[in-house]
Amino acid sequence: MIYGLIQELSPAYPIRVLCKVFGVSKSAYYDYANGKSGHISDAKSDLREAVLAIFTQHKRRYGSRRIMLELRAQGFEVGRDQVRSLMRQLSLQAIQPRSFVPRTTRSDPARARSPNLLLDRKPLCRGLREVIVGDITYWPAARDWLYLSVWMDLFSRRILGWTIAEHMQAELITQAFAKVLHHGRLDPGTIIHSDGGGQYKSGRFRELLRKHQLKQSMTRVDNHYDNAFIESLFSRIKAELMDQYPRFSDIRQAQIKLFEYIDGYYNTQRRHSSIGGISPIHFEHAYHRKTVDQ
């Protein structure tokens, strides 16, 4: 019980600090300490504790919708409005992703831009590994910037490959894409979608795509919303990880913390509304079971 733990630690640490660490309000703690919550039924008390535990476990990354899904998975019969109400009572506020601000990698006008193969494609994908989307984003470090390259399966939202480095040369995206290939062979004709940055136009990357018979697709010129899927992903990663690490101390820390977040949390635990409120890994497992049964 979070409040009981705060009470146990209070002789050694200030209440204000403990409440901040555990993500609860001082007023809610003092209500508990003064016995004002004694009239609450056991069932409601259990629900409050479950909400608080989920919120703390996911490090303020879950709002009412995902907490509701987690509660239902645990056997609670609860609606989103009820969760919202409990979160307000407990003064729990989830991290909010930043607004999408379009950015782009540097384009190379000397190299031809591939067409956008997703424009008239409906639905965008019907199964795994049909469309892989990628991009590069920036992350502040102690001395300079770090560059994160990510490739994501558009159907399952699983991050299949990523690399962070102190440069944004073509090697950055090819190393990340090599991890995609490590997950298994991509069928010929799989669409690989990105912006028109010079890294994606490089001979090295295009030769890699030709070798595996993959189709390259790029956003239209000055239309960054063509790759909104990956931009939304970056917005979420930065909001949820920068809250703890606004600036990495060095490349080693960046690699460790991104591995913990992407491979240890985002792919395996974090519920996604676009895939039925489950994690990408669980979604892929369910998809494989379904295709085997058919």
Task: Set out the residue ranges of the language-model regions.
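Charged DNA-binding/catalytic regions of mobile-element recombinases
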Residues: M1-Q294
